[in-house]
């Protein structure tokens, strides 16, 4: 998981000279401000809209939009899995030809990017279809076993409008595959980020603290302790990061001096912020205090990351600044409002988990039974 804010060319004092030995003109202050301002804005969009869509996703019953719930066990294992993946990629790039690895990764992310972008633009595109558009419903269903032992492996519902969105997304996919243009990269990166915030749900605040705390250590080690993360980020030709040129004002769309932000720095804090929005809604106070607090904390943390990176001219582990801000600010607000207990007792169940469904049914049965008893006593 790429989770660092850096400038691949200007990440250090020596980086003004590219690998071919030619001198790269230094970026102008205006170009730097435009690049990092754009990265900040691009990071906020999937968090904000992904959080809003996560609420509808949690309430929805569509099998194609079921969220994936992260438990405390998943959160504890995630930094280990991410470290193994990162180290594996680093070794692959050292041992095998970078050209062939990136070719395979490009094909893989070409397919994933089309699906993610199609899912992202579908709600917006629905507004442009005429009322008499011939929209047909489809279902892709794969099962294993038969009778009572039948188990659904894939159950995806879609319609003709989704197929149109898939076609439009394929155009972006071909553009990315052929040109590797930074705009196509960012379209896929934004789609991945929004889908991650929307569909990955933490089951409670404690799990979020475990996940962010573990990745806090992960980020510091792999950025400051080794050059592994920065090396992989530079070698990895896939839309796992948002990029924006610092020389856009001089070279236009053909600019090539990029600042970058890993998608991990968007999705990981984003799913925690989305959880706090759902917690806000569960309080039924018609306020989104914790969501706005954590959202402002993210802006502060990422802004501080960019500032520190610019001062020290070195890639920064963004989660070093984002994690304390995104956890600390909402907890301080909860302390001030006396809602710490409510915050840490808020729980979301996995809609795919039969045990959770059974427990929910039992709770509703018990609740209705207690109501009947109360009526009889009256």
UniProtKB/Swiss-Prot annotation:
GO CC, any one term: endoplasmic reticulum
Major subcellular location class: endoplasmic reticulum
Enzyme Commission number(s) of this protein: 3.4.23.-
Membrane-topology descriptor: Multi-pass membrane protein
GO-annotated biological processes: in utero embryonic development; membrane protein proteolysis; membrane protein proteolysis involved in retrograde protein transport, ER to cytosol
Renumbered ranges of motif PAL: 317-319
Residues that carry a glycan: 10, 20
Keyword terms of this UniProt record: Cell membrane, Endoplasmic reticulum, Glycoprotein, Hydrolase, Membrane, Phosphoprotein, Protease, Transmembrane, Transmembrane helix
Region of interest (Disordered), residue spans: 1-27, 346-378
Basic and acidic residues bias spans: 349-378
Pfam family, one: Peptidase_A22B
Active site: 219, 265
Keyword flag Glycoprotein: yes
Ranges annotated as spanning the membrane: 32-52, 78-98, 101-121, 158-178, 182-202, 210-230, 257-277, 291-311, 315-335
Molecular function in Gene Ontology: aspartic endopeptidase activity, intramembrane cleaving; peptidase activity; protein homodimerization activity; ubiquitin protein ligase binding
Disulphide-bonded residues: none
Phosphoserine, modified sites: 368
Subcellular location: Endoplasmic reticulum membrane; Membrane
Domain free text: The first transmembrane domain may act as a type I signal anchor. The PAL motif is required for normal active site conformation.
Subunit field text: Monomer. Homodimer. Interacts with RNF139. Interacts with DERL1 and XBP1 isoform 1.
Family named by the database record: Belongs to the peptidase A22B family.
Function per UniProt: Catalyzes intramembrane proteolysis of signal peptides that have been removed from precursors of secretory and membrane proteins, resulting in the release of the fragment from the ER membrane into the cytoplasm. Required to generate lymphocyte cell surface (HLA-E) epitopes derived from MHC class I signal peptides. Involved in the intramembrane cleavage of the integral membrane protein PSEN1. Cleaves the integral membrane protein XBP1 isoform 1 in a DERL1/RNF139-dependent manner. May play a role in graft rejection.
UniProt name for this protein: Signal peptide peptidase
Organism: Mus musculus
């Amino acid at each position: 998981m790429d989770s660092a804010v850096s400038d691949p060319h200007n990440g250090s004092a020596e980086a003004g000279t590219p690998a071919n030995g030619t001198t790269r003109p230094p970026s102008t202050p205006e170009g730097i401000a435009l690049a990092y301002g754009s990265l900040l804005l691009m990071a906020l969009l999937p968090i904000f809209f992904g959080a809003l869509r996560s609420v509808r996703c949690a309430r929805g019953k569509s099998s194609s939009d079921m969220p994936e719930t992260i438990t405390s066990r998943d959160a504890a294992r995630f930094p280990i899995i991410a470290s193994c993946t990162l180290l594996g990629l680093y070794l692959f790039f050292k041992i095998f030809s970078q050209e062939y690895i990136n070719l395979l990764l490009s094909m893989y992310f070409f397919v994933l990017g089309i699906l993610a972008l199609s899912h992202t633009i579908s709600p917006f595109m629905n507004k442009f279809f005429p009322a008499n558009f011939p929209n047909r419903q489809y279902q892709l269903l794969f099962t294993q076993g038969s009778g009572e032992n039948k188990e659904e492996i894939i159950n995806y519902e879609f319609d003709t409008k989704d197929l149109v969105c898939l076609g439009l997304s394929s155009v972006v996919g071909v553009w990315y595959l052929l040109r590797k243009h930074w705009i196509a990269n960012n379209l896929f990166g934004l789609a991945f980020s929004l889908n991650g915030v929307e569909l990955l749900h933490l089951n409670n605040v404690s799990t979020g603290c475990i996940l962010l705390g573990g990745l806090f250590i992960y980020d510091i080690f792999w950025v400051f302790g080794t050059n592994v993360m920065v090396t992989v980020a530079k070698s990895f030709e896939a839309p796992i990061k948002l990029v924006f040129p610092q020389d856009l004002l001089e070279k236009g769309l053909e600019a090539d001096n990029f600042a970058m932000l890993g998608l991990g720095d968007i999705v990981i804090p984003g799913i925690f912020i989305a959880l706090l929005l759902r917690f806000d809604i569960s309080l039924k106070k018609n306020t989104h205090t914790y969501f706005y607090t954590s959202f402002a904390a993210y802006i502060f943390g990422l802004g501080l990351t960019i500032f520190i990176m610019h001062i020290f001219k070195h890639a920064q582990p963004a989660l070093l600044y984002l994690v304390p801000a995104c956890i600390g600010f909402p907890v301080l607000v909860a302390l001030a409002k006396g809602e710490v207990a409510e915050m840490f007792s808020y729980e979301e169940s996995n809609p795919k988990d039969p045990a959770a469904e059974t427990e929910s049914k039992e709770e509703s049965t018990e609740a209705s039974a207690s109501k009947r008893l109360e009526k009889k006593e009256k």
